[in-house]
């Protein structure tokens, strides 16, 4: 900065390379340096200065202008700051050539002021001069010249001195267009700052005709160059309106806020979860304090969203609202004495880590889908093998971007997120939507028994989250016919939730590409909360900032925007007791997403239970935040009466492993005491993390049998954490998990492979002990009330392999081992490998 200021005065020289070379070689010559020193001495010689002034006065008199050189006599010096960036000094001087001060009595009644005297203070100004200070710093010096009587009065009366200093500062501001810090102006002990330079007063002589009258044509020779215009005769000055007396207030220093990001190459990988965050890592605040000598004179206080700076001498006051919440415990401040700058570095409190998607796109990464069993890619593959003709025509006409396996074609039924879609109409029969389904028919997924092919651009659709295989979720489907069709003779029922990038519902249910053109789409949204704010993450790339149209109400928030020729809109509503603050939301937009921060009303601070989300207020669905209340409610429903009716159990053992803001881990063990050969324990592990995207399945095997001794009721509760729909998974070590990943295949192929795998480890007697049936119960939602959609599944099963037969290869003896426990450092993709241990 100092180098730039030093070189600014040399930029107007405009020297060529040859001239620079000549000057360099000349100053290396000792004879040239001696002559140059003599020339400088002649310029500073007082006798030569007087001769120069006399010659200039004679030349100006010939032009009809009287010139007087005003030599400033030292008085006192005012120190202040110039434009809040660097130091400045104002020399209050005196000279007899300036007019003497005068006063006249005034009542002050017309201005509302007290009676007193109105003073007239003539002054003379000289252009500012720049000097080099210590540590290569630069400062400006201005000279304001008054009559000696004015300075004499100022030395005797303190009030008159304050008026004189205020007049000098105001004159410099008006004449040179700069901003001086009047509040922190301080009088120094020095009488003059810098080298005195004479100012010039030019007044026209009365009755003198100019050298060439107006209207006379110019001669053949050009006029002699003259740097000043001919002064005009002073006219009567109009009285200026009185200025209102301003109360002295502390000076607000200049500052700059820089957002600092750390470059991480992981954010630039070719992956769906790699994207630079719009939230910076640090905030660097640079505060200009040109009059502050040390950091001891200032008091700095930083809170979560506010920076406060106070100083008495000099008088500074700054209240800066920070754009992001910061960690005040890990911030640092440093004062640069050379530049008189206070640099404050504050680390930003990063939001909860973004959940990494656990769903692979079948079209984009087929090799990943082939390696993992039970993924969306296999569900789509099996669905395409068993698709029907009417379903293909519906997919082509409607353009839905979903892929659902049919129950009739493959023996696998894919349920909607809370409910099953109604069966399709028969061939040649047109389906008429019901009144309750008319508005949301275009958002529903494929019914059981039909398959819809994804559109070619379904992988990169903004609404679908980049997943071509999506489950449908709607509040309109609720017919009993759909439930009856889902309870056929299928051996396996699979419940899928494809969450895409953000764990949201399908593209059709969220208003994806399957919607009609011209209608707004519902964007994928993540929601996180703390006690005072709500943070919304809109996962739509390339949002146009000028298209944002928001409407904020204490009970709801509505936003409409556009991106890539698509229009998006969503409606966010909360419970009546949960209210938002009406302050303006903080919006940050990047190339990949947008972050919106909403403040909670002071009377509603704390953790909220649920929130309602949809494209408008007519199609809202309830979502739950992860908190202790919601988890306790889920455990009460899991441990309700169906367990007691089906099995004779001891009191359940519940162990809370970990409870944090981002993770809740509970271990509940249900034991049976009646039969030791049957199921000894059932462990449920609830692992709900707000920063991971999980896709969970409940898959069971069904083999014909007549014996059923026990039943276990399992409920899947959907709880939203940071806007994600996640299911509590019922993990059991029974035989139902032996066919994990094969439920998407056709029924005939699945049964043959299952029998082949089972014959390697099971006897014929153990095969007859396998029995499992799935009964799906659904809750209907009231049209006037928004409630959570809970999918309840009752599983009747018989304990599988609770003993191991070990054959000695030497003597052929067989040893039966019961209650075998094996600890493994990793989890198997297929539970059959665990049973073969």
Curated annotation (Swiss-Prot):
Annotated TM spans: none
Function: Required for cytoplasmic pre-assembly of axonemal dyneins, thereby playing a central role in motility in cilia and flagella. Involved in pre-assembly of dynein arm complexes in the cytoplasm before intraflagellar transport loads them for the ciliary compartment.
Listed Low complexity bias regions: 445-459
Pfam family, one: PIH1_CS
Descriptive protein name: Protein kintoun
Biased composition (Basic and acidic residues): 428-442, 484-498
Coiled coil: none
